[in-house]
Curated annotation (Swiss-Prot):
Species annotation: Wolbachia sp. subsp. Brugia malayi (strain TRS)
CDD domains registered for this protein in UniProt: GT_MraY
Membrane-topology descriptor: Multi-pass membrane protein
GO cellular component: plasma membrane
Task of the protein: Catalyzes the initial step of the lipid cycle reactions in the biosynthesis of the cell wall peptidoglycan: transfers peptidoglycan precursor phospho-MurNAc-pentapeptide from UDP-MurNAc-pentapeptide onto the lipid carrier undecaprenyl phosphate, yielding undecaprenyl-pyrophosphoryl-MurNAc-pentapeptide, known as lipid I.
Transmembrane segments: 3-23, 51-71, 77-97, 113-133, 143-163, 175-195, 199-219, 225-245, 250-270, 306-326
Keyword flag Metal-binding: yes
Family matches, as NCBIfam families: mraY
Name of the protein in its database record: Phospho-N-acetylmuramoyl-pentapeptide-transferase
Primary site of residence: membrane
Recorded superkingdom: Bacteria
GO MF: metal ion binding; phospho-N-acetylmuramoyl-pentapeptide-transferase activity; UDP-N-acetylmuramoyl-L-alanyl-D-glutamyl-meso-2,6-diaminopimelyl-D-alanyl-D-alanine:undecaprenyl-phosphate transferase activity
Family statement: Belongs to the glycosyltransferase 4 family. MraY subfamily.
Pathway given in the UniProt record: Cell wall biogenesis; peptidoglycan biosynthesis
Length: 326
């Protein structure tokens, strides 16, 4: 059995075995489960109540153990693991505060983003010490390259933080974030292979594919467990950093188009509401609810319908990226 196959099945099987025990453990220590926003679609208040969160612990454990055993400790893999675990810690604190207060509010958005950016910027600055001037260059598409020079570290940190929070926003329906994560890691792993990136980055993608697939088994509608911020923030950061390490940050925006759309829907909604409130005295909304997957729920789409259609969009965009933009 070759190394990629061994890593995939190890992460998948370990996650599949660990998940049921972890779900039972979470139900014992937290009977209320993940707090649900009162403004959420009505069915969420019924179907998602008392569902345990922090399932990201299973994904991270199942992913990182094979890396620890079989993947060489290159600068790339050390940075990936360090950033992923750092963002997992931020997510854990956020989840813990929510569960403790039995509220959907944890760390404030400003505090969370500030800590994330500092962590990512420090990580990228230290990593730069291992590389030549090519580190500051990135590909746009079709071999076109741009050099960010001294601005590259902040740019890379922005990608990591943006990806982290975009995945967090997407994690609002059963199976939605997990399917998008799997599709994105498959695409980034394929791009990494085709561009002859460091093998450790490819193996990193493979182990997260296996672990997230096993989690998805228990996260499909009706979900038995949610990944929580400890999962979405850390895995989102891992996705963004993977695109940075293979120098395909711009292409990641196409591959992860759903993450981009989810984030933009929130930004547009907030800005439009503030603008109309300032101009007319009363705020107006463009969407029924954001992130945009909730808008489609309010329109009458089922959770599974949204998850599958969003996945189709991601697959089409990924194929387009590999076929025409790489």
């Amino acid at each position: 059995m070759n190394l990629p196959t061994k890593i995939f099945f190890t992460s998948f099987i370990f996650g599949f075995i660990l998940s049921p025990y972890f779900i039972k453990f979470l139900k014992k220590i937290s009977k209320n489960g993940q707090p649900i926003r009162l403004c959420s679609p009505e069915n969420h208040l019924i179907t998602k109540r008392n569902t345990p969160t922090m399932g990201g612990v299973v994904i991270l454990t199942s992913s990182l153990l094979p890396i620890l055993f079989w993947v060489q400790s290159t600068p790339e893999i050390l940075l990936l693991v360090s950033i992923t675990l750092s963002f997992a810690l931020i997510g854990f604190i956020d989840d813990y505060l929510k569960l403790k207060a039995n509220s959907y509010r944890g760390l404030s958005a400003k505090t969370k983003i500030l800590i994330q950016f500092i962590v990512a910027l420090v990580g990228m600055s230290v990593f730069k010490l291992y590389f030549t001037e090519d580190f500051t260059k990135t590909f746009l598409f079709k071999g076109i390259m741009i050099d960010f020079s001294y601005l590259y570290a902040p740019f890379a940190a922005f990608i990591v933080v943006g990806s982290s929070n975009a995945v967090n926003l997407t994690d609002g329906l059963d199976g939605l974030a997990a399917t998008q994560i799997i599709a994105s890691f498959v695409s980034l792993g394929l791009v990494a292979y085709m561009t002859r990136a460091d093998i450790s980055v490819i193996l990193f993608c493979i182990t997260f594919i296996g672990a997230t697939l096993s989690f998805l088994w228990f996260n499909t509608h009706p979900a038995k467990i949610f990944m929580g911020d400890i999962g979405s923030l850390s895995i989102g950061a891992a996705l963004g950093l993977t695109s940075v390490l293979i120098k395909r940050e711009v292409l990641f925006a196409v591959i992860g188009v759903i993450f981009v759309i989810e984030t933009l829907s929130v930004v547009i909604q907030v800005l439009y509401f503030k603008y109309t409130r300032f101009k007319h005295g009363k705020g107006k909304r463009i969407f029924l609810m954001t992130p945009i997957h909730h808008h489609f729920e309010k329109k009458g789409w089922s959770e599974n319908e949204i998850v599958i259609k969003f996945l189709i969009i991601t697959i089409v965009c990924s194929v387009f990226t590999v076929a025409f933009l790489l």
